[in-house]
């Protein structure tokens, strides 16, 4: 599974399924048998308020906690209400049963610098974990706010989303990460606009080709500073 496929599955859970925060649960539907099981499997779930929530859940509600959302999807969860764990199978696909802190310890290229985060990376803070889905957003399962699998703002403020300030991020070793695609642009104007707005990673050969066609950049003050930066880069003066 690659990072984009993984994120699509995670977002699908957040957007298209009824979910509830249930400690120790990796996607089980809230059948009567599962309610009895999870009301007694963990001290957190034994709290009166949490037990009331679990018992009130409909049978088409799936239980998750933060790290078990990630593990559940990697273990094959597919929203099958007829299966004990919603289609997931315990500890398959080479993915171990670890905690949130254990999962970030398994991750690669762990960093506190969020300027280079990629779609599908785990985002972490002590005792809690989620998945970055792009555009400054993450998916997490938390008892906070909506008490379910939900989309939140990742280390930024975005209208319509609750904000979570994560500490670290890293690549899950159980999926592959596609390299960022470069984009070939047809005109100098296009490439200047794309670079100014941070839309794409563009190869230097494309910059060289585009500089020769920068008609708008030469006349529009808004583009002038970037034009000279490009010119210097292409001519080895940057």
Each PLM stretch: what is its role?
Residues 119-121:
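Loop/turn positions that initiate beta-strands
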């Amino acid at each position: 599974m690659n990072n984009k496929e993984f994120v699509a599955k995670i977002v699908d859970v957040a957007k298209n399924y009824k979910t509830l925060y249930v400690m120790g649960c990796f996607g089980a539907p809230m059948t009567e048998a599962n309610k009895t099981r999870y009301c007694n499997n963990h001290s957190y779930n034994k709290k009166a308020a949490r037990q009331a929530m679990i018992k009130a859940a409909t049978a088409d509600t799936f239980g998750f906690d933060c790290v078990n959302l990630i593990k559940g999807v990697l273990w094959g969860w597919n929203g099958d209400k007829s299966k004990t764990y919603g289609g997931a199978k315990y500890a398959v696909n080479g993915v171990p049963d670890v905690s949130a802190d254990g999962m970030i310890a398994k991750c690669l290229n762990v960093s506190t610098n969020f300027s280079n985060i990629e779609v599908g990376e785990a985002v972490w803070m002590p005792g809690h974990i989620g998945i970055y889905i792009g555009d400054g957003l993450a998916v997490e399962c938390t008892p906070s706010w909506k008490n379910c699998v939900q989309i939140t703002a990742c280390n930024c403020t975005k209208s319509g989303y609750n904000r979570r300030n994560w500490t670290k991020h890293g690549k899950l070793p159980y999926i592959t990460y596609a390299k960022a695609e470069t984009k070939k642009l047809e005109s100098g104007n296009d490439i200047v606009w794309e670079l100014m707005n941070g839309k794409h990673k563009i190869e230097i050969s494309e910059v060289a080709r585009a500089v020769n066609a920068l008609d708008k950049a030469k006349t529009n003050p808004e583009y002038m500073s970037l034009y000279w930066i490009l010119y210097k880069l292409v001519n080895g003066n940057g």
